[in-house]
Each structure stands twice: as C-alpha cells, then as structure tokens.
Amino acid sequence: MGHTLAEKIIMKHIGGKDVKPGDLVVVEPDCVVVHDIYTAFLRDKMKKMGLTKVWNTDKIVIMHDHLMPACLEGDPRSLEAGYELVKEYGIRHFHAAGGIVHQLVPELGYSKPGDIVFVTDSHTPTYGAVGCFSTGVGYTEMAAVWGTGQMWLRVPSSIKIQIDGVLPPHVYAKDIILRVLGDLGAAGGTYKSLEFCGTAIDALGIDGRMTIANMVVECGGKAGLFAADQKCADYCGVDYEDVAWVKADEDAEYERVLTYKAEDLEPVLSCPPYVDNVHPLSEVKGVRLDQVFIGSCTNGRLEDLKIAANVMKGKKISSHVKCIVTPASNSIMEEAMKEVQMVVEGVYSAKAARSLAKKYNVSMPIVEEVNQVLFE
C-alpha cells in the first residue's frame, strides 16, 4: 500500500519506518518559529521548566510581526521578551518588522520541501505550498521543542482534493479554498492532511498555493500539502531531483476524495457568521460594503496585489468605503512599488503605517519611500 504526502514526510523524519493514520510518532523538526504574541509566555514557560539551553540554535527562529508597532499596553513586554530570548539562549535567527511570519518563513528559506516545521500560530499550514509539513503548536509545546528538539505527532488521515482543467477568468486560488471549505464544513477537515493535486493545481504559482494551504486550518486541517514540482524547487532554491520524492504515491489511501472540474468553479464569498457559509458572488451582488481589506498572510502577496490593482484600475473607491492594503512583507511592498501602481483614491496603506511608525518611533524606510511617491 502506498502512502500519502503527509505520511511520506513523517516517515522521512522517523528513519523510514512505516506509518498509518492514527499512529503516534516523535519527530525532530527542521525548523520552529515563535512570534511576538507568545515570546513572553514562552520565556516564562522555559524558566518554569528549568530549561537553560536550547537543542539547536540554527533551527529556532523568532519573528516580531503581530505587535509591530506596539499598540496595546502589554505589547512592549512581549517584544522585550523576544530580545531577551535572543540574548539568553543565543538564538541566531531573529526578524523584526520584516513582514508577516507566514510570508517570511518560506520567503527567507526556513521551510523546504519534505521538511517539518512548527510555529506558534494556527495558519502555519501555509508552508505546505512548498511541500513542507507545517502545523501550529502552543507555547508550552514550543518550549518543550526548544529544550528537547522533539515533538509528538499523531499521523493524520488525508483528504485528497483533485481539481483538473483550466480556471475560468476571475476565479483564483481563494475561490478554490473557499469552495472546499464550503463543501467540507468548518470542522470537516479536523486533524486531517488536505492534499491538493490536479492540472488546475499544477498551474497555480506558489503565491496561489500559499493562499490555499494557509486556509486549511479554517476547516480544522492539520496540514495542507502540495507535491514538490519545478516551481516549488525554484522558489525554495533547491534541486528538483532532490525533492522529487515529495509527492503522494499513486496507490495512496485517502479517507475521502473531492474532485472538481476547474471550469465549474466560480467567484465565491465566505459570508457571516461562519467561514463555511460560502455563496457565489452572484448571490450577494449589491450588498453595501463599508471596508475592504487586501492583504494578510492569506492574500498579501504580489500576485494578489496585481490582481487587485487590475480590478481597481481606472476606478474610484466610493466615499463611504475604507480600503486598506497591507503587503505581506517588506520585499513584497518593494516589488509592488516596481510592478503595481496602487494609487487609488481612498486607499490607506503606507500613509497610515507612517503615522504609527512615527508615534512609536519605529524606523520604516520603505514606508517613507512609498509616502514620498504616493502622497507628497
């Protein structure tokens, strides 16, 4: 019997031993990341556990992204804890205000095809876009990994999602994952590995795959995985021949299989009050909008900004609508400045960022450059 992609990655990390869904295994991750929401909690837990050193300073990353710039009274304590962890434990990889953690981890090369990565955040499955088994953990588990280099896993069962064909115009990766969420339900993927394949999936770029993998947690997914291909290898800077094994076996056994014709998909929206309340755009046409947000760890990449810019080109945002744009990382903002003109009346992005940066004395040179171009 063959194995799913999740099973093959886990097997690689336990010496090739055969596994099946439900098995409990202990793995050493290739990388672990903690962000600023949990640095103070992690530091306290490390002290309570009596951990005075970490297992591998090359495999531990701290990122400040959620609380930059600090807005609430308790935020500075969390940021300070991050710097203290760097000093106390000799952490070698530290990033502050460079972007959203789920963009930076693959962008900076901390996730590779066939890796296992843990992060203190629910949307960690994002890195499955590059064939990495990645999932979120709490700060207690993270403290244990820091000290021991080990984490237990229950091998997940897998759901195969196959989409073949060519996507219609104006149907994107977000429409794919929302359709899947609507079909599975908000709990339909609980502790499952959602594994995406098919010609329509193969045609997606890494940006689109990240959007899909990022959202599998919205149906309870443990991981969202894509097979490694040449696009993936090029993005990660690895030789494809070295990662060609990062794919499911043809005779892999799945708990469930969902199949779609790409041509049948259409633009959809996730409507209140639940993420699986998904409706075709045509059904909600005419609903008044008060605020539009373009960005986040789900849709803040260059491909997303290009699509949004093309939609808004030549148009004016209504006076009652606030439109906010937040690129997922500084490098994406820099690329967007070169390739995408987001000069649309009523858009709040760099202007608001400069005000916050000035208030909290945070240096953001790229924001200053954007403001000079757009507003001065």
Regions found by a protein language model. Give the residues of each.
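Fe-S-dependent hydro-lyases/dehydratases of central metabolism
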Residues: 1-338
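NAD(P)-dependent Rossmann-like dehydrogenase/reductase catalytic/cofactor-binding core
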Residues: 334-376
